[in-house]
């Protein structure tokens, strides 16, 4: 009997996996939201605009730079200030606020050498080509109802809840900057329990550390995390330095595109390195990553695999991908090669087709720029649709 128990244990695989999220008031996320707010303002007037907008935020200043080709006119300082105001930096006591911060802009046009590879009817490939070379990943897993990894899903819920209780004045001493981190214990690839939770939230001077810890536990952590995943051994770290008054762009310089793992799958899937925010959908860094999620999510929702990762790579100016790779991590009901054929037969991976299928030439990007681009339950994104399930089941013979 002892031998049998030991043998069973030998084949069981327990491990920990951790993902983090940051709030909308985190300096890098402030930058992302400003870049995407500018993108939305331009797309509202000119859906065919080419936008690559980068933002830097620091004490008392926001700097906007990049390459933009458009017929639209946008009051960028106004967009920047409104975004900062909506996030919640509304007092000079924070060292960064929407009324007094300086807004500087330095914008050029898109390079014509790049444009001829992207414009339909121009360049060597007359179809609309990829805006750059690169590799993008899409991923889905059935371990949560939104078909996302559990660690990043719960981490995002914590930072969203922090913003809710701050903006509704349930905890009026909270400030916009916050970070969360969730560690899940897996057994044979199945989430079993929450092993550790870290939540650091900016606050004003009025709250004591003990009162803050109690309030964060009762108003943010307990209402957010599933009680059946928490046990006596779950560890909680609430503002573990003891103080977090200085935060936001005063505490750290923020830049667009520095939270690419927070934006995607929390490290559970691979990442090609390209950021999303501030880029119009002709940039495959963004549109192909969204489409990769759409492909993977539909395949998992169809029951073809319980976990799936797809890699797609492009050459600048060329419409068709140069490579496609599929990994079902041994969970596929058909082979990875067969899944690849399903993808090629049921999804069009050319940049123009992606934009058309997902209807991406719309001002929908500001809302992607905090709390993750994938697996959202608070907003509806076209790449989260599961409208290919029956088609894929039929094609797979399931």
Curated annotation (Swiss-Prot):
Pathway: Amino-acid biosynthesis; S-adenosyl-L-methionine biosynthesis; S-adenosyl-L-methionine from L-methionine: step 1/1. Coiled coil: none annotated. It catalyses: L-methionine + ATP + H2O = S-adenosyl-L-methionine + phosphate + diphosphate. Its cofactor is Mg(2+); K(+). One of its GO terms (biological process) is one-carbon metabolic process. K(+) binds at residue 54. Mg(2+) binds at residue 28. Keywords: ATP-binding, Cytoplasm, Magnesium, Metal-binding, Nucleotide-binding, One-carbon metabolism, Potassium, Transferase. It is found in: Cytoplasm. It comes from Desulfotalea psychrophila (strain LSv54 / DSM 12343). Its EC number is 2.5.1.6. Catalyzes the formation of S-adenosylmethionine (AdoMet) from methionine and ATP. The overall synthetic reaction is composed of two sequential steps, AdoMet formation and the subsequent tripolyphosphate hydrolysis which occurs prior to release of AdoMet from the enzyme. The keyword Cytoplasm applies. One of its GO terms (molecular function) is ATP binding. Residues 110-120 are annotated as: Flexible loop. This is S-adenosylmethionine synthase. It is an enzyme of class 2 (transferase).
């Amino acid at each position: 009997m002892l031998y049998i128990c030991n043998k069973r244990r030998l084949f069981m695989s327990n491990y920990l996996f951790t993902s983090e999220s940051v709030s909308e008031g985190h300096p890098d996320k402030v930058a992302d939201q400003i870049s995407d707010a500018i993108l939305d303002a331009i797309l509202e007037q000119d859906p065919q605009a080419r936008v690559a907008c980068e933002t830097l935020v620091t004490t008392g200043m926001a700097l906007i730079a990049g390459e933009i080709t458009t017929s639209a006119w946008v009051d960028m300082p106004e967009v920047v200030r409104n975004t900062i105001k909506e996030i919640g930096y509304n007092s000079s006591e924070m060292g960064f606020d929407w009324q007094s911060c300086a807004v500087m802009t330095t914008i050029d046009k898109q390079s014509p050498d790049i444009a001829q590879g992207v414009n339909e009817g121009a360049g060597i490939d007359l179809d609309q080509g990829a805006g750059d070379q690169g590799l993008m990943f899409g991923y889905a897993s059935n371990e949560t109802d939104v078909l996302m990894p559990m660690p990043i899903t719960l981490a995002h819920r914590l930072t969203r809840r922090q913003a809710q209780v701050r903006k509704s004045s349930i905890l009026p001493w909270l400030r916009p900057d916050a970070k969360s981190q969730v560690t899940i214990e897996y057994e044979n690839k199945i989430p079993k329990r929450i092993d550790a939770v870290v939540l650091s939230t900016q606050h004003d001077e009025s709250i004591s550390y003990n009162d803050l810890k109690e309030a964060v536990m009762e108003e943010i952590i307990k209402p957010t995390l599933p009680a059946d995943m928490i046990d006596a051994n779950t560890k909680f770290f609430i503002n573990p330095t003891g103080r977090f008054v200085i935060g936001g762009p005063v505490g750290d310089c923020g830049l667009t595109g520095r939270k690419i793992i927070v934006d995607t799958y929390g490290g559970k899937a691979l990442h090609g390195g390209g950021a999303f925010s501030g880029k119009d959908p002709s940039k495959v860094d963004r549109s192909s990553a969204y489409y990769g999620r759409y492909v993977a999510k539909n395949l998992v929702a169809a029951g073809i695999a319980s976990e799936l990762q797809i890699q797609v790579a492009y050459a600048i100016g060329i419409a068709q991908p140069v490579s496609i790779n599929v990994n079902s991590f041994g969970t596929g009901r058909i082979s990875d090669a067969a899944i690849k054929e399903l993808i090629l037969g049921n999804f069009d991976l050319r940049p123009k087709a992606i934009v058309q299928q997902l209807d991406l030439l719309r001002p929908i990007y500001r809302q992607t720029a905090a709390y993750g681009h994938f697996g959202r339950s608070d907003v509806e994104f076209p790449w989260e649709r599961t409208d290919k399930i029956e088609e894929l089941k039929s094609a797979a013979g399931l």
